[in-house]
Amino acid sequence: MKLRSLISLCLAGACLSLAAADASPKAASAKICTTCHTTDPGNLRGNFDNLALKSSSFQVRIDDRFEVLRFDQASLKVVTPEPAADVAAALRSIAKGHEVRVQYLEKAGEKVAVLVVAKPPVKVAAGDAIGLEELEKLVALGPDQGNYFLVDCRPTARFMEGAIPTAVNLPFPAFDKNVDKLPADKHKLIIYYCSGKTCNMSPGSLQKVRALGYTHAKVFVDGMPGWARKHEGVLSPPSLKAAYLDSQTPLVLLDVRPVAAASKGFIQGSVTADPTGMAALLKTFPAARLKPPVVVVDETGGEGAQAFARDLVQAGYTGVNVLTGGFRAWQAAALPVATGTLGTKVVFTPRPRPGSVSPDEFTRIASLAPTLRGVVILDVRNPDETQHGTIKGALTIPEPQLMARLSELPKDKRILCHCSGGVRAELAYHLLKDLGYDIQFLAGEITILESGEFLLD
């Protein structure tokens, strides 16, 4: 009997060991950060995301996942490029998507941030930098007449979403594999750019190319973001297909050819756009704050598409690109061609935040009597907010208290979570999802009356 118990115990231990071995640890650093940095234990590197001062929390995006961190304003240290009045102001100054390093401590099963460092601008000597105005002149001349070699050293996936005209893609992480693609003339002007002022890939490329003996290399520090604020970019037909169409990434695809010609063959999803009707188009165009990717198509990728794209950029849109070679290049690449009637109205719906519930779905469920929902409405606002009204039947747990009150949350029911503006609800979503709860969150704003009625923005 004792032997049988011992064998069972050993087998159980073996199973636990195998399960532990199979559970791969979560990455502490975004892949792009590993190009230039190592991450010490107790640290995270990624992109700053939502900030919820009401619950003393923020989240960091690490590739396709999120980490939720708590903080105490009395003890948290925040380092930003520009000084701030206090911790709250410093955190608010960090733009969404900005690269950060966070040092944290584990307390009661939660990560508590003790240091947040916003990545500062890269340091490039004045003689090693090229400004926007000089780059504009060179791009207008072209590589042959301007005698330059422009390199986009971002990862290929980013390059395919749009690049500075005339650039070639030599990603910094694969620099050593692409040495043979550099100019034979080691005195030729080589210009590197990447993802902007905080990106180390172009300075890193500069250092490597200098070590190979190239004497005339520079960095466009503002990178693709700096170019896109002033000018249109370009992308090839295969890039359009791979980066947007195959992945079903929302975009605005504008065909500026005459309707009669375009209807004989166009890229699926295209909307016809009259080059003389920009003012009318902008009245129904998605708001610039949504940052819709825009691709403009004409017959050859020539002046017609370029002029139309320039007008969109001047109207405040970034991420505007011209299809290199136009529709002819699309056909030459043997890519799918649609015929018939093009769209006439621009419709752009940003990709929903992972885990979000649509406003219509939330409204439909929350409007039902609590006994008919079959769903838990979780309100994670603070008591000073919920005292003025809650959705009838909602479970109220302030977001900072979630981990201590898990026993109140059912594991066998769907949970729809909300706060007042979506930020704390998303923090709650990531915390509970990681624990196995069936949860979604409302990403937008909601106003709840004392009667329990609610209005969605």
Regions found by a protein language model. Give the residues of each.
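Short, solvent-exposed interaction modules
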Residues: 149
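Bacterial N-terminal signal peptides
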Residues: 8-17
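Rhodanese-like catalytic fold shared by cysteine-dependent sulfurtransferases
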Residues: 2-4, 21-138, 157-192, 196-252, ...
